[in-house]
Structures are given as C-alpha cells and as structure tokens.
C-alpha cells in the first residue's frame, strides 16, 4: 500500500479530511475567538489550517484527535496561538497520551519539573516550572522528539523507512553519516518531504567544533599531511567535508591503526584531548537484526540481509532488492518474523487508540505497534483506499466504494495492518486467508483485477495462512472488547515505553522501600546492539551478537559497559548450522523440532538433543504398563533423597544414577541439610556464607560451590539488598547481618507470614524452612510440610505417589490446573519445559566468568521478559534434566484475566525460545535454550469454582516483596 506523496499542506488537509472534518479556508467568522487565535499563525499556513479546523469542529472525538496532532504543525514556540487556544477552549486541553515529550520526563533534574512534565500535554505546560537554563537535557529531548514526530510521520506505514528516520532523532548525539545515508537510501522513493525534513534537522544540528581536534594533526607521520590536516580543520565544517579532505590531502584511506585516524576516532567521543574513549567493537550496524539473517531460507535473502545489517549500509539497489525479493516473500517468514521482533516486539495490551477503538481494552492480547502513530496510519490508509485502489508492493487491488461496502471490515483490515496484533505462539501478524478472500469477493472490483488474478490468487500471495495459530481473524476486531474496567486487573508499566530512548524499561518487582510511593517501573541505562540499532540491553549484562561480518553460525559475547557501548568482546567457536541429524533414516536440519515417542527433540548443529522422559506406547505390553512408574529408568517410587554435586536434590540414588551421576558424585540426604561451610574452606579474613545453587554447566570443568567467601568488614557500605535473619529481623544487606552476629534465614525483606518457621516442599523436591526461603531461591511451593514423595511425572504415573500429600485449595477464580513435573499439587500457571545445550553453556562459562551457570541465572533473565507485574517467574531443574519455568499469578485472589495474562506470557516466551529470536537469544545465557514446550491452565467459569485460595496465590505475594501484600494471615 503506497504512502501519500503530497506537499506538507496537502498532507495536513488529508489528515483533517480523514478525521471527518471538511476543509475550512478562512471560514471562521471575522472577530470570533477562533479567527483571533488563528491569526497568530498567519505566517505558518499549516498551523493556520489546523487551528481553523479545531475551532470549526463540532465533534468532541474529532476535536480531541486534532488537538493531539496540533503540536506537529504548530510548534510549542508559537506561544501566542497556544495561549489563545488555551483561553478560548477551556477544559479541552487535557493531558495527551500522545504527547511526544512524555518519554523525556525522566531526564528532568528537578522533582517538580519531572512531575509537571508527566502531567503536561505540551511544552507550554512545563515552561513555568522547568527552567530552560537548568533543564537542558529535558528541553533538548522534547525538541528532538517534536522534530522527529513531524519528519517521520511522512513515512506513513512504511516500517523500515520510519524506523531509520526515528533512529536519527533517538539520541542526543549528532546523527552519524551511515544513519543519514540509510534514511536517504530507504526513504527517498517513499517521501521526498521526509528527506527534506531530516536534512533540515541534521544540517542544523550543533556539531562539535573541528578545531578541537587540531592536536590530532601532529600525529600524522607525513609533514604535508600535518599541514593539510590543520588547513582542513580550520576551513571545513561538516564531517563529510573533513573526511573527504583528509583522504585527498593525506593520500591515505581512514585506517584505525593509523595514528592520525586513531586520534580522530578517539576525539570524536571525547570532550577533551587526551581523554580517550575507545571506539565500540565491530558488532555490525545492528547486531540484533544481523542475527535474523541466518534464518533466511534462500541464499539471496541471506546475503542481502547480511549486507544491509553488517558493517556498512547497503546501497539503494540492495535495499530495493531486499524489499522486492524478501520483504513480502512467504518463504522468508522466519527471517521476517525475526526482524519484526527486533523492530516491534509483540507486547501485551493495547489502549488509548482514537481511531482503531475496537483494539482498545485488550490486556491479554499481543500487539506489535499499538501506538498513536499506527492509529493515525490506519485512518490514512482508509482514506487512500476510498479512492478505489489498494496499492501493494507488487500489485494494485481495485476495490468498490469501501465507504458503503463492508466499511467496518475494511477498517479492521487497515487497523490490523497498522496495529499488528500477533499470535503468542507464531508471532504472526497477517490476516486470515478466508477473511481476505471474503472481503475481496464482496468489495473487490473484480472486473478490473490484474490479468489472471482472482480474489483467491491475490490472497494466496498476501495472506497464505488460514490456521488460527498463524493468522489474525478479523472477526475479533469487528466489535469492541468485552472487557470494561476489568482491564485494570492486568497492567503494563512498560507499554507504552515511558523511558528515554537510550534506557531500558523494567517492571518494578521490588516494591517501594519503607512504603514510600514509587513508580511501577524503572528506567535503567543500556547499550544498543550497533550504531543503527534500537534494540537496547541492560548495562552490565553479557550479550551474544553475530560476528560483524555476518558469517552464519559465528558469534561473539560482549558486555554492556558503563559507557553505553558494547565492550570486551570475545569470539566464540563458529557453529556449523549446515550440519543435520539422521533420525530413523531421515535427515533433520539444524533447528528442526520433532517428537520421538513422548519425547521432544531438536537438531542443533548436527547434535540430537532430546528430553529423557520414560514413555509408554500403544505397543507396550500389559506387564510393561503394570510395572511402569514414569520415573527415569523406571526407578521405583521411593523417596530416599540424595544430594548431587550440581546442588540438586534427587528423590533417590536410582534416579541420580539414571541422569548420569556416578556414586561418588552424590551423597544421601537432601542438599538443604548439608552445611557447605563445614569444613570451612574460606581464609580467616573472610566469612563462609552458604549459597545454595543448582548448576547447569559441567561440574568437572566449573565446579558448583554451595558457599561464598565474604570479606569480614568493620563498616558495611554495600548497596541495599535486604535479608532476614533467623530471629525475623531485617538487615539492609548480608554484611550488616553478619556484623551484628546474626544468622541468615532467607534473602529478601522479612515477611509477617514467615515469622514462624513452617517447612514447605518446593517444586524442586527440596524442603525449605519457610515459604520465604523457597521464594528467595526462586522456587514456588508445592505443599506444606517436608517433602515426602517423588511426585507426578507423566499422565501414566501412579496417583499413589502423592497419596499422603495434602494439597492446598486452588484459587477462588478457578482454572484447569497443571501439575509441574515431579510435583504433587495442581496450580494455576503457565509452564515451560525447556531443553538446553550443555556444551553451549560450558562454552559461555569458559569465555566469560569461568564460573558455573545456574538455574537462577536463567530464571532471572527470563523474568526480565515478563511484562505484567501480576505474574512472576519461578522454576527448577527437573529430574528429567529439563529446566521447568513457571509463570504464576501473584495476587491474593488471582482473577481469570490474570491467569490468562500469565498463560500468554508463557506462550510468548515459548515461541521466542523455539524460534531462536534475538529478543531472548541475544541475552547470555538464554542463547543456550534450544526448545520449549508450553502447558497453560485455562480458566473455568466462576460457577465451577469451590473453596478459597489457601496457598499458591497468596504465598506468591513474596515475589513482589510489597508491603501492601502483607495483609494475609494463615487461617
């Protein structure tokens, strides 16, 4: 579908027409309030037009829409017109959710300024509270966002063009030449207005004074080059002119090892001479998208993708070829879905749309682009389609008058293409083929269809899928959501993103210290995965990125440093993704998943990785069925726990041996009963502190110590990391606790319902002293009392295994529960059973910390990808050597909507693991997760529910650590 190519004024009029407002040219009565206000914009025709439309509008909804868009055409600097409209239209200038300055508010230094910014709808609203000379960063960010909103709106629904445009305005540094070149290459044919707008911005951007780098000229080895360098820096202004002049004057190309060019590289990021900031490593222009290139099915698209996202932007021809050959090719759905994950990840929830209103109030559905800009794009598309033609990249589809032929269905199509609802499993965003065929048969102008084309053939190309797990049924969006205020039961603190462009939004799961008010999210510093990337990772984390040249299967691991750049990169051995597996005489390519009996398997670089579940088949004899226990190696159902070297308690020695452990690698008794500090292996200057952990890496290579040595300090200056002692007293950190001579009970704030020690059995088969102790280990609780049974592993397992266990009641809302493997009691949750590559984990540990990688590390990383604070992540290593991840509601009485949200989060993460999406795979050690199976607990009607929640939903409050949740007492 083509975008509008018109002047800025005609584009504005099209916007107003699409809003349903007739154009009024000088139609306001002379002397009226509207005429007086609009006369303040007589030198800005675009602003005058929108002003007249505002005062002519009779519809509240249209007025609201126009007011939201007005700042794009009437800059905040036009104080007179804004003051006039404020006084002439009292009550209508309320906070706009779409204000471009909202994402800048965290940059405010003053608290009052920050609060005013978050309540504002325009820059005028903060001018009295926020002083420009003091809040430079805030006002710079707002001005940049205002300019970006105007420029990038010309991209229409062209995702790539809009993305490259937004990258120009995303940071407070001067746009790089490659960024500007990318916009020119990809947007020139789409919107000349956009190019002109961006050029105006980049040319006006305050550049660093070239004379600040004069000292670099002395590093040139050639005297003539030294003189040429000084002359060029004194006379040239732009970066391009300087680079071209130096190449010509010094007769040398820019080489990083050349002292002259090395100095320029350093000084470009350093404010003062001699203060060196090393240039970022070569991670490609966009490491996240480069990861997607290996998913291309054709060599042509793989090469084009690699060329575009590796070390230098492709030329215009490369972009056009990628657009023509790959961007809409159904064969390349894996690569395209991966790229979409990077550009616009699927996120739960959609609200505050003014045109696509049927998409609002859907807190448990996933969308890629629920934004005011996409909402506007859908309205613009509808206006274009009303002209009788839908322009697609390879075909123009003639249609009848869509204002009278199925208008609501066409609106659903336009909104779906822009808002992009996506499946939790496939993450696909295309509409279903049957809907496509139906609407084209009814409303397509079939007499004008291109030769040899029918509704079916057109839809076969545009929407080839009709599987409800791969396509979006339009029927869902032909009516408003059935949910009203109930949507408040599920919140999305980071959607839309409230943080500045260079920071990462994280859900606040720690609560507020001392019951002080605080935000439900936090903004943390991050790094981009390349110059042109908008994929941000947390500062201090390890990241896996493809090699900068884009060789398939070659990766490096980097750390996100304090500078905001990826640094300390370490190459990993390349993986041969061309290697296949032979299974049952059939060849399985890398990444293929399949089942063998009841086990799930995946081929990973020629290695077959399978779960180790014991299976019964239709051919099993009666004797086999009678003796079948469901346990590994068909071990007897006997609970005589042993503690293995990896820190995991196994139900019996038989099961420990079955998972590959030798007799000398485990000892009888649960791990929790062992004292790792006896004997004390720490030096006298350090204190031995128990630190139980379950390790996933090879013990012989990296060990798995169950303690840590902490320095004995006279003063404790560590950051706040609350812990609770055995007397139920809280301390700010471990250092303070031990300094006061206390013993650790559990990590985290003290909780009232853990005052009395009451043992509980965790899903991992470990007995904990309290619920809080289990939760500090990120283990959810199965039942009260010490562990006494092996638990259920399969549908064939005997129910007698858990006969002596008394399970707590399910939640009041009710659900169709699940039973985690090895547990006895059902619960309402989403569950993932994940296979991992142990060799990959060993490699990661070897090239990074040389320390073992633990289950808790995996869970903490996965936790960052759960966006709903009403759900939290727990898990353990099963006795079948799978990582079991549970996404469980945390509220007192979880509602059906909250259970559904946890289910959707689980399905989303399963899809990201199975598709090797960079959304997850970029994060070390999640890149070692190979394949996942999901199981969710669907909600039941309230009439089917009996009992009150006595355990699971209440105890999970600990995951938040919020004082508001401390109301519960045991019955």
UniProtKB/Swiss-Prot annotation:
Lipid-modified residues, GPI-anchor amidated serine kind: 942
Cellular localisation: Cell membrane
Membrane topology per record: Lipid-anchor; GPI-anchor
Disulfide bonds: 633-658, 635-654, 643-671, 716-735, 724-750, 761-787
Cross-referenced Pfam families: CC4_RECK, EGF1_RECK, EGF2_RECK, FnI_RECK, FZ_RECK, Kazal_2, RECK-like_N
Quaternary organization: Interacts (via knot repeats) with WNT7A (via disordered linker region); the interaction is direct. Interacts (via knot repeats) with WNT7B (via disordered linker region); the interaction is direct. Interacts with ADGRA2; the interaction is direct. Interacts with MMP9.
Primary role: Functions together with ADGRA2 to enable brain endothelial cells to selectively respond to Wnt7 signals (WNT7A or WNT7B). Plays a key role in Wnt7-specific responses: required for central nervous system (CNS) angiogenesis and blood-brain barrier regulation. Acts as a Wnt7-specific coactivator of canonical Wnt signaling by decoding Wnt ligands: acts by interacting specifically with the disordered linker region of Wnt7, thereby conferring ligand selectivity for Wnt7. ADGRA2 is then required to deliver RECK-bound Wnt7 to frizzled by assembling a higher-order RECK-ADGRA2-Fzd-LRP5-LRP6 complex.
Family statement: Belongs to the RECK family.
Name under which the protein is recorded: Reversion-inducing cysteine-rich protein with Kazal motifs
Originating species: Mus musculus
The organism's taxonomic lineage, starting at the top: Eukaryota, Metazoa, Chordata, Craniata, Vertebrata
Gene of this entry: Reck
């Amino acid at each position: 579908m083509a975008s509008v190519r018109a002047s800025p004024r005609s584009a504005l009029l099209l916007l107003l027409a699409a809003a349903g407002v007739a154009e009024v040219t000088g139609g306001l009565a002379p002397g009226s309030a509207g005429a007086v206000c609009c006369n303040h914009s007589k030198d800005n025709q675009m602003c005058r037009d929108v002003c007249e439309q505002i005062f002519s509008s009779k519809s509240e909804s249209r007025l609201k829409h126009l007011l939201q868009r007005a700042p794009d055409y009437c800059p905040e600097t036009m104080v007179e017109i804004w003051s006039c409209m404020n006084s002439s239209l009292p009550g209508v200038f309320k906070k706009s959710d779409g204000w471009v300055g909202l994402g800048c508010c965290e940059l405010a230094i003053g608290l009052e300024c920050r609060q005013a910014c978050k309540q504002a709808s325009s820059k005028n609203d903060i001018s009295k509270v926020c002083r420009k000379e003091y809040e430079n960063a805030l006002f710079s960010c707002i001005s940049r966002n205002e300019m970006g909103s105007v420029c990038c709106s010309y991209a229409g629904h062209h995702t790539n063009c809009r993305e490259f445009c937004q990258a120009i305005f995303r940071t407070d540094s001067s746009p790089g030449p490659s960024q500007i070149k990318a916009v020119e290459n990809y947007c020139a044919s789409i919107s000349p207005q956009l190019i002109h707008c961006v050029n105006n911005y980049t040319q006006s951007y305050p550049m660093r004074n070239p004379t600040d780098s004069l000292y670099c000229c002395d590093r040139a080895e050639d005297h003539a080059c030294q003189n040429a360098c000084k002359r060029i820096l004194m006379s040239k202004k732009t970066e391009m002119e300087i680079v071209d002049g130096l190449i010509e004057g010094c007769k040398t190309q820019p080489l990083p090892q050349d002292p002259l060019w090395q100095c320029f590289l350093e000084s470009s990021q350093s404010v003062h001479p001699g203060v060196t900031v090393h240039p970022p490593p070569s991670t490609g222009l966009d490491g996240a998208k480069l990861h997607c290139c290996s998913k291309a099915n054709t060599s042509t698209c793989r090469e084009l993708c690699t060329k575009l996202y590796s070390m230098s932007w492709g030329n215009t021809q490369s972009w056009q070829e990628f657009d023509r050959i790959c961007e809409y090719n159904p064969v390349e759905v894996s690569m395209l879905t991966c790229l979409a994950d990077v550009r616009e990840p699927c996120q739960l929830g959609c609200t505050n749309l003014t045109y696509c209103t049927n998409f609002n109030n859907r807190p448990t559905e996933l969308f890629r682009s629920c934004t005011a800009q996409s909402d506007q794009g859908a309205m613009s598309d509808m206006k274009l389609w009303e002209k009788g033609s839908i322009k697609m990249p390879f075909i123009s589809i003639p249609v009848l008058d869509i204002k009278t032929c199925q208008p609501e269905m066409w609106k659903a199509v336009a909104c779906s293409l822009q808002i992009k609802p996506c499946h939790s499993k496939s993450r696909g965003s295309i509409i279903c083929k049957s809907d496509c065929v139906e609407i084209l048969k009814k409303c397509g102008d079939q007499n004008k269809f291109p030769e040899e084309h029918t509704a079916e053939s057109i839809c076969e190309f545009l929407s080839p899928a009709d599987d409800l797990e791969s396509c979006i049924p339009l029927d869902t969006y032909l009516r408003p959501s059935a949910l009203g205020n109930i949507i408040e039961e599920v919140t999305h603190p980071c959607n839309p993103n409230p943080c500045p462009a260079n920071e990462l939004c994280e859900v606040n799961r720690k609560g507020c210290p001392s019951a002080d008010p605080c935000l439900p999210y936090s903004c943390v510093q991050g790094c981009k995965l390349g110059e042109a990337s908008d994929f941000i990772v947390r500062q201090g984390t390890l990241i896996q990125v493809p090699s900068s040249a884009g060789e398939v299967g070659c990766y490096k691991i980097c750390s996100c440093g304090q500078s905001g750049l990826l640094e300390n990169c370490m190459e990993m051995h390349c993986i041969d993704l061309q290697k296949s597996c032979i299974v049952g005489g059939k060849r399985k390519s890398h990444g293929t998943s399949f089942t063998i009996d009841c086990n799930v398997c995946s081929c990973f670089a020629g290695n077959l990785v399978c779960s180790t579940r014991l299976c019964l088949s239709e051919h099993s004899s009666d004797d086999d069925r009678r003796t079948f226990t469901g346990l590994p190696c068909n071990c007897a159902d006997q609970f005589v726990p042993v503690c293995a070297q990896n820190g995991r308690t196994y139900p019996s020695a038989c099961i420990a041996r079955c998972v590959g452990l030798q007799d000398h690698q485990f000892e009888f008794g649960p791990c929790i009963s062992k004292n790792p500090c006896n004997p004390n292996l720490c030096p006298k200057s350090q204190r031995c502190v128990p630190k139980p952990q379950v390790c996933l890496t090879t013990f012989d290579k990296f060990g798995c110590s169950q303690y840590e040595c902490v320095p004995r300090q006279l003063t404790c200056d560590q950051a706040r990391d609350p812990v609770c002692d055995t007397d139920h007293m809280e301390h700010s950190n471990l250092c303070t606790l031990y300094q006061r001579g206390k013993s650790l009970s559990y990590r985290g704030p003290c909780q009232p319902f853990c005052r009395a020690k009451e043992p509980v059995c965790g899903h991992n088969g470990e007995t904990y002293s309290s619920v809080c102790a289990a939760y500090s280990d990120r283990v959810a609780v199965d039942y009260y009392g010490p562990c006494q049974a092996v638990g259920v592993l399969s549908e064939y397992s005997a129910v007698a295994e858990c006969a002596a266990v008394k399970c707590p009641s399910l939640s009041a809302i009710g659900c169709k529960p699940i039973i985690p493997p090895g547990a006895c009691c059902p619960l309402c949750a989403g569950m993932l059973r994940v296979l991992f590559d142990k060799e990959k984990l060993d490699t990661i540990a070897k090239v990074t910390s040389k320390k073992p990688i633990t289950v808790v590390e995996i869970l903490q990383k996965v936790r960052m990808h759960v966006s709903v604070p009403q759900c939290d992540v727990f898990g353990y290593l099963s006795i079948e050597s799978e990582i079991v991840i549970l996404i469980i509601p945390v509220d007192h009485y979880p509602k059906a909507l909250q259970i559904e949200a946890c289910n959707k989060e689980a399905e989303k993460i399963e899809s990201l693991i199975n598709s090797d999406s960079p959304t997850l795979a970029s994060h070390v050690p999640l890149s070692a997760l190979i394949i996942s199976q999901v199981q969710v607990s669907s909600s039941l009607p309230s009439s089917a529910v009996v009992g009150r929640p006595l355990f699971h939903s209440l105890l999970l409050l600990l995951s938040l650590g919020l004082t508001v949740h401390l109301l519960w007492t045991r019955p």
